[in-house]
Amino acid sequence: MTESDTKITLIGSRLAREGLEFIFKGEMPECKKCRLKNTCLNLEPGRRYRVERIRSKDIHECFLHDSGVLAVDVSRAPILTTLESRKAVEGAKIMYEPAKCGKRECSVYEVCHPEGLLKGDKCKIVEVLESLDSKCEAGNSLKKVKLAW
């Protein structure tokens, strides 16, 4: 992980621990009047990030977090999802396409439609994990994979 792979942002002091993964939800009404909002809001809404390092123990006041916020380094977190088995090749670079399935009752629906990944994202398959053929209610041949975006 290089310095250019991380961003400095602020996170609630109760949440600030290395390894924490979160989905950045974006600006809240309370943020409009904050002098630190540019640092807080420099992430892409709807994306998954991981806290890599706590930069300082200095707590900054926040209108949203009652215990204040801390400066942290974050990186894009890898995301678990599914791909067609024939496309699941470790190290391959792909353009992400979500599964074409609307079976919300399926046990793997949440994995097939992960939060934080968007159609058309350029990703690298970091790891091919397991076959999900027997779990897919639509009968698709799927593999669970870890993607870096």
From Swiss-Prot:
This is UPF0179 protein MA_3685. Transmembrane segments: none annotated. It holds the Pfam family UPF0179. PANTHER family: UPF0179 PROTEIN MJ1627. Belongs to the UPF0179 family. It comes from Methanosarcina acetivorans (strain ATCC 35395 / DSM 2834 / JCM 12185 / C2A). It comes from the Archaea. InterPro entries: UPF0179.
